[in-house]
């Protein structure tokens, strides 16, 4: 995108697949086009590739460290402005899964909701009663897990638990 934004006729040949592990010095692409456009876009393209490769690599390392197919490593909704889709794609390439794409695809019960509702279970029950299908409940104590699940939470987020 960086190169074609400056030279729509730029020829780009990708030499590796997305998510493919590569070593230092590996050529990732071959470009043919306007030299000024290439040099202008180079740093932005390299920085973006490095950033996304770092995400995919770190996620892959964490997934391997978990060494448990029953566990799923989820990302955060908190991404760099303008890079959400790319960062979430990098997470998937590394073997992780996306937690939420935005605020629209799941309700998240947090400590403020629990405080207003009076309990974790009641906060989840209210979301269920409102017709919410995907309910992620944040818990910070072990005794909150069962009530959250019994009330209908579809996922738990363990917050600051040692």
Which role fits each region the language model picked out?
Residues 1-151, 155:
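Acidic/glycine-rich phosphate/pyrophosphate-binding loops and surrounding catalytic core
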């Amino acid at each position: 995108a960086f190169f074609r934004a400056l030279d729509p006729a730029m020829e780009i040949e990708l030499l590796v697949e997305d998510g493919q592990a590569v070593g230092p010095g590996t050529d990732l692409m071959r470009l043919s086009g306007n030299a000024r456009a290439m040099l202008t876009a180079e740093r932005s393209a390299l920085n973006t590739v490095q950033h996304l490769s770092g995400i995919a690599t770190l996620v892959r390392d964490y997934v391997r460290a978990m060494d448990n197919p029953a566990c799923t490593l989820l990302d955060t909704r908190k991404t760099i402005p303008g890079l959400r889709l790319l960062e979430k794609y990098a997470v998937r390439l590394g073997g992780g899964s996306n937690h939420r794409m935005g605020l629209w695809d799941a309700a998240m019960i947090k400590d403020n909701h629990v405080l207003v509702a009076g309990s974790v279970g009641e906060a989840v029950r209210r979301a269920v009663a409102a017709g919410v299908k995907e309910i992620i409940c944040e818990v910070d104590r072990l005794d909150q897990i069962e009530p959250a699940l019994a009330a209908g939470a579809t996922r738990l987020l363990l917050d600051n638990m040692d």
